[in-house]
Amino acid sequence: MKKTMLAIILIPLVYAVAGETVADDEVFFLSAPQLDGTLIDSWGTDAVITGSTLMNRLWKTFTVSATHTLREYGRVAKSVNSTAATKCTHLCVPGTVLKLSVQATRSNANNNASWRFARPVITNMHELNETCIPMEYDCEEVISEKTSLNTLSITIYGSNDLKKALGENSTCNKTWTQGCAIATALTALYENKSVDARKLNILRGTSYTCLLGYLGIGELEPNSPCWTQLGPMCYGPLAEQVCVTAGRNPFGVVPRADRPVSTGVDCRVGSRADLQFSGLTKGLFAERGCDRVFVRCDLIDPYDPPATAAEFELHVECRSSFRVSGFPGEGEDMGLELAFNNFGLEGLIRTKQDRLTIITGIFDIRNNKYNALVINWIPTPELLDTFHMFMAELDTFRKIHRPTVRLGVVITGASPFVEQYNFKLLSGVVDMVYIHPQIQPMTSTPTLTCPMPIRSDSLECGEPHRQCPGFDGYRHLTYATRFLLGHISPEKLTLGLDVSCQLWGRRVRQYDTNWYFQDNLFSEVQGGWVSRGYITDVIQPNMTQAIQLNGCHGVFGPELDILLPSADATPYVGLLWSQPSDLEDAVDFSMALGITRFSIEGALGDVYMDSSENLKTVSTVHEAVTVRMRAHAMMEEMLGEGGLAAFDESMIWANVTRSTGTATTGARKRRALTTQGPDGVNRTIPFSASVQSGTSIVRIGTGPKMVCPGIIASVRGLLFSRTSYQGFYRLTFFQNLYVTQLQNLTGCTAVKPEDLPVITQATKVPSVFAIDINTFGVVNGSEYYVVGLEGTDLVQYSPQVKQSCAFINTNETFNQTFITIDERFFFTGPRPVADGFVIPAGINFFGSDNIMTVDYIDFNVTCMNYSNPSVQSCIATVCAANVTECTPRATLLCNQTAAILLDFQRSNELLKNSLVDLDLEHEKVKMFAPASGGSVPTSDKFGLSVAAITMSSAALVASTAALAVATLAASKIDGLQAQLDKTADVITELGDSIALISAKLDRNIRAVNGRVDDLQNQINLQMLAMDTNFKRLATGLKELGTTTNERLGEVMAYQQWYQQIMSLTNQVTQGAIQIGYKVGMIRTCVKSLLAGTMAGCPTDASSFRDHPGLTFRKTVRALLYRDQKLFIVNEVPQTLTARSVQVFIPSPTITEKKVCWPDYKLMHVDGKVVAPLECTGKYCSEPIEATDYQECLTNPSTCRYVCGDCYRGICYNRTTEDISIKFENVTHALSVSDLTSPLFNSIPQIVSMEMEIQDLKLELIQLQKINTSVHMENITGDIDAMKATIEEYRAEMAKLRVTGFGEWLKYFIYAILGVIAIGALIAIIFMAVKCYQARALLSMTAYQPVPTRPMGMMY
């Protein structure tokens, strides 16, 4: 029995030293940063050496028992035959005392004792006290209240049950704070309980907006921090679950192990402040609000730069003796800031060697006694690429030589230059970023700087209450990085269309109507208009502070009801700007939303500017407003009252200059966005910043703000949605697409599609406008499927197809890197996932729960056919009673019948040829008859055999099992022969029962194949009816006179002959066609059967009916020809599950000189890496384990590699550490490693599970699963009689000590009972020859055709 062992992990993990051995297959271990060989005393005082082993002359190994008090959260992890921990099982709070056992290696080299430790282990999990909470989570998860979005942080900060145990006893009495809203959302997710959405409004527009998507409120943003930390999750306290799956993650975000960064405030001291050093104390820094201290180092003379890179260190002034009274000293809380100068470095950083020389010199400054390094370099646009290369190379050097030093960078926050930074590169290189203020303070006292990590899950806005320099830039950077950290640029943010309604208010006063904001104008950051970085503050009168609603900070001071201001309140919009065009665009956007009244009373946000800058702001706003108000009035005049008139927008702006602008800002009021003229066309003014179709956000209506996921397009006032919302209409020619008019949208209430009304079908193209639903473009032709307006009515129009078959192809209108199918994302190119990349291969079906189904083809066909001499001519039929006198009269009557007889003869010959073809196919399928060398069936013996099918040894067991459903094995035929000879009497006794069963089976078979039999019977009945009717008519006519009777008799005889010939021709032609179709079907079917498929065979089995594509898969397990029937046994799955299938490419291994890619063909199914699938079309067998790749993970020496920068369309740049694929650049954290180290030491292990494969047993109960398309009469009573006879026979055979056939008879009876159990009463191959003989005897009686008399003798 295995020994259960526990251990604790403290992040970051410290893995065991080389050479460590673990005796057990499964261990739980402890690894902590403080156990580094130098702090053994921190374990406690009860460390005891329990044993020692001499390893060599210098090293000794001891087993040490000790106790350890956790200083932070401890993680209990389990590992199986690996040093890599991926899943943790317990979480221990700080202060927990643990009993440990650890192997320590002590060195006495050079008389200096040093220690090295393997991984500490706890051998008894029951010793963990109640402060260690059992739970499952990823060991790499970060615990952070500020970014508490992963499973571990949800457990700590979201669960009420665990707050006490984990030392978190705070409660949320003020639900309007951001922290309480986060706790409320996380608690709802953790406990799967409903939550009041109104308590979460404060999260909108923040870094935690994405939490709302997990709760079913709105839609999760694809590049949100929630996906990185929470991953796929379902929340379903109500009837309908809300699930965020991998299919909704279009960028394949790969979580990186980012080091946590404190969000405190740093202080900078200039290098020339050495005369002030004696006065710098810890108290002074605390008074200034400093958490860390940085010494700034400058070039001695920026205008006299070093001549070479080697002289760089000599030209930097940085005091090495700097100390602050009260601080612990250099290294712990001290940092170094290097100020670069573009002019001084431009000639020294062009080559990689020069940059490496400078980097080496940087780390030599101050003798490495600092814990953080900040590069203060604002490059020119020409040096920006060089700057990125320099930072990447600096980070690589740091990771190798100084991994404990944190790296930061100072960047500019000015727009538009900030958008030029490569934040995807910097986010993987630096730990924090500082904004360079526009006004640089010149002081020798400590000045504040505010660090900010460049991660979308931890975007801070500086610290506004600390008054950090450059605070405006921090706020702009918040928005810039939200776009630029994604995998697409801001101008391409058109993944979806959210419909948001802005909350407006209107106050009617004596002199005017005033529109005002009731919510933040820019509460959602989704459109390209944010690129210049202005932010809106909503200001209430008589307030001491501005309420900032841009998502970075909550409300300071008392709670304010900003949504419902007082009646006499006048709101103000404060704008931050960096250039006049920002303000102009803001005015454009406001006017497009209906704002026509502006009041300029000052400037907000320019707290760092002087009075001249404030004056410039006022002047710029005034000019922007007056010019646009004048343009607004001109466009109003051009629009007129009759709807949308033709106008040239560029001409208007060319004519409207600052000199023509009116002096007042109270110009004519803007018409409402949804006001319609007589023709029903929505009038809008297309300002340059107005909301247009195709942008990623549209604000409409007068109700509260709402988000409708699933809206995919907005064209000409029509909304198209993939989700069925109340108020939308269904389209009849396009499923899963719904449409409504924009002005009618009042809410986002999802309903069932069938509950929506169907849109009206128009008979012509809509006259107002028509939108092609394939391209969402406006068209005017009649060859498109369109939706549009006919007057004021919403209608659809389908093209009038003039030919019998029409194929309409949609032209390609755009290219994108992914497509959506049923609301899921599928990629057209590679994308990164954990440990590799995936390339979509499509959606395939995987089968399970296989059963046997049986079908058969009957070759026993009865057809009526006539030889040409047996069909009398027209003259012989008409003149049969009086040949001499009738013939001259009938000649004229019958001289047109040659063509009629010719048609009949052709049809008759066609039928004969079809029967010959059928007989030929019949002879072909006899190859599936029992083997000729076996037992020859006789009237009193059962003839059973195995179909002769060629197969591989691997398929032999399965095929034998399939044949057992239809027959016994051929190897038993010879052994049964002697016993069969002694069973004649028993067979005779069973004959009557078998005959009865055969009769019932015949009736069912006739029901299936009786179409020809019924045809024959109908012809005979028609002939009999005609014979009787004409005889009666002839008898009555004789009374009118002999002459008249003869004439009428001749006419009626002709009519009867004509009708019979027409009927026979028609029936024979139909028979020929039916037989011809059957011959073609059989010929195609046999070809498919020989290939092992049912592709060309008719079948009514449910698996084939529901999935026709399954017929192309090799499902045929047995074929047997018997008694003019070909029986087909298929093995098909009862369940077919659709799964996403992707090609998997493992991540490469990066060395200093090479990029090596594991060379394996792998697939990715359900999040697992598997071997290549065995598929036919879209139908696949269950995935199997990739044993060779697993062996590579377990033993890297067995791996196959292909080395090179590019592999299968994916390239790696060793300088920037970027993974480049066809449609994007992905920063994929790949560590530099040595070729001698394990190549996959960071990849979670794959546990190999061997499946127990048992021999397939031919259990008779399997017959209960037979599924057939033929349904037959119940023969239970007949079977009961047979049971008694068989039991008597078994008893007699037992007396004779003869076994085998009696057991087979028992097998036979239970096989029939198994068929009865599922209602499919068909004997198939289990029936005896006597059964078929009886069936043949009954068939001869049932199918005997009525003899044909000469046509002229029928009346």
Curated annotation (Swiss-Prot):
Glycosylation sites: 81, 112, 129, 169, 173, 192, 542, 655, 682, 744, 780, 811, 815, 860, 865, 882, 895, 1213, 1225, 1267, 1274
CC terms in the record's Gene Ontology section: host cell membrane; membrane
Subcellular location per the Swiss-Prot or TrEMBL entry: Host membrane
Residue stretches in coiled coil: 1245-1299
Domain of life, source organism: Viruses
TM segment ranges: 1308-1328
Bilayer topology annotation: Single-pass membrane protein
Keywords: Coiled coil, Glycoprotein, Host membrane, Membrane, Signal, Transmembrane, Transmembrane helix
Signal peptide segment: 1-16
Name this polypeptide is given: Probable major glycoprotein
Organism ancestry: Viruses, Duplodnaviria, Heunggongvirae, Peploviricota, Herviviricetes
